[in-house]
Each structure stands twice: as structure tokens, then as C-alpha cells.
Amino acid sequence: DYISCRIMNLFVETFFNNAMITELFLVMRASGVDTFDILVYLHEHTELYTPAIKEIIDRFILMTKEDLYDSRKEAENVLNNPDIVQKHLDNELGINELLACKADLYLIFDDINHLIFRAAKDILVTNNKLTVSSEMFLGQLCLFIGCRKKDFYKYEDEIEMDFDFDFKEIDINGYDIDLDNIDEFKCQKKSLRFHHTSFQQKIIKSMINININTPV
């Protein structure tokens, strides 16, 4: 089913490409759970979607269907119409629904972050691998990823948060951590400060100014 494949493509773009949630996927892989299995679980369990996520996916499906033609002949007629082609070139027609909806999903980062972690934990429960310690760690990893990657465009903001796991050491290990051994990384509460350097702020500000009116 074409629409089903397109939805999976949206999930791959949103959660996997550009390393958006890579820390979770690395931990899960080290614990015997494949990344694709998590994405398939998301695809199959639509009941987990928040209203905001469901609205974006429904819009993505609608836009995808609008791009389809009833016949090859109809598609050829459109392609052979110079006026329609020119309107696409002038951005008067057409939209990259994949990029548009990926951006919309990023803007509700808390929703998608909690969704992917919910899927991961459900799989661990099914495999009888979710312990008190691993559940606690995944909860804090979810917060950690949110602090690092949510609202990047608020480049002057600073966030400080306490954690019960040594995320600096975990990061050094490349998140190649089997959840069965997660207690080894427990520590006294450590406070981490998340912020952009002045150089990073300059780059982000420049990219926002360049792309603010760019059509998707």
C-alpha cells in the first residue's frame, strides 16, 4: 500500500534521519531491539498518537493522496501542460509534504519524543526486558534528548537539569549500553547545563534568516 509506505517514510525522516533520536536507537540496538522494529511498532499502533500527531499524519495522508492521479494518461496530461509546470517552478503549486510534515512534527517535539520512547518501552515489556532501572533510565534519557534537541531555534536559552545517570560517560561510550547493565552508570545526582556556544548561536541565527521564507 503506497500510503502506508509513505507514512513509514515520514517516520524514518522524523525519527531516524539527522540523528534526531539516535541516542535511544543506539541503546535499544545494544539491548537487542532493532530500530526498524520500533518504527514498525509506531506505524501499527496509531492509538498511541497524541491528537497533535494524528492531525499532522492525517494532513500528510491527505496531501499525499492529492498528488496521486487516477491514470497514467492524467499524469501525462499534467506533465505536458507548460502552464502547470511553470507554476510548480514558481512555487505557486505543489508542496513537499514530507518536509512540511516532518517540520510540523519537530515543532511538537515533546509529543514525538514521548511517543518513540513509549514504543520502545512497550517492546521491552513484550520481551520481558523492562526493569525498574531501565524504565527509570529511559525516562531520563527522554528528558536528556529533549534538553539537547528541542527548540533549537531558541538559541539563547539555557536549560539546567539533574540526572541520576552519568550521561557524560554514557555519551563517551557512544550509547552502546545494554539496558541489562544500566545500573553501572547510576550516580549521585549530576546537574547538566544545556546551551549553545556563541559560534553555534551565530550559525543557527544565520540559517534561520536564510531559510525563513524558503518554501518546502
Regions found by a protein language model. Give the residues of each.
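Polybasic, proline/glycine-rich intrinsically disordered low-complexity segments
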Residues: V40-L79
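Charge-dense, extended regions
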Residues: R72-V216
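Generic structural hydrophobic/aromatic packing signal, biased to beta-strands
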Residues: Y2-C5, N9, L24, I38-L42, ...
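Hydrophobic, Leu/Ile/Phe/Ala-enriched alpha-helical segments that form helix-helix packing faces
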Residues: N9-V12, F60, T64, I116-N127
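Residue-level signal for secondary-structure boundary elements
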Residues: E13, N17-M20, F36, T50-K54, ...
